Amino acid sequence: MTTTLRATFTVQLTPADPIPGSAARFDLAKTWSGDLTGTSHGTMTTAGDPATGDAGYVATETFEGTIAGRVGTLTFLQLGTMAGGEPQLSYVIAPGSGTGQLVGKLGTLSIGDIDEDGNHEVTVQLA
């Protein structure tokens, strides 16, 4: 059975030492509210030039908190690409990453609107 959840997050990106070659690296910290309440921390690497419409990033973050009343941790994985200005995003829960009451949980996350204060709307399909 899949449950649809709604949440928002704000994100703080802090530049970190780049990966040799060309990839930029950032540490990220998110604060979640709604059906997901807690924090997540992780790392993002980026390549390309968004100004030209061609770029990409990968990110791994570990969420700690409560999801639909269940307490534990999960790891989220993101792959974002933009080719010719057309964005694509994959945002999933890493299989086997759950702890506590979130053991065995799988799912996908979809980012919706981002308001002027940086609040990201998220829909989560949790199985």
Where are the regions that the model predicts?
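Targeting-peptide/extracellular-domain and disordered-appendage signature
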Residues: 1-127
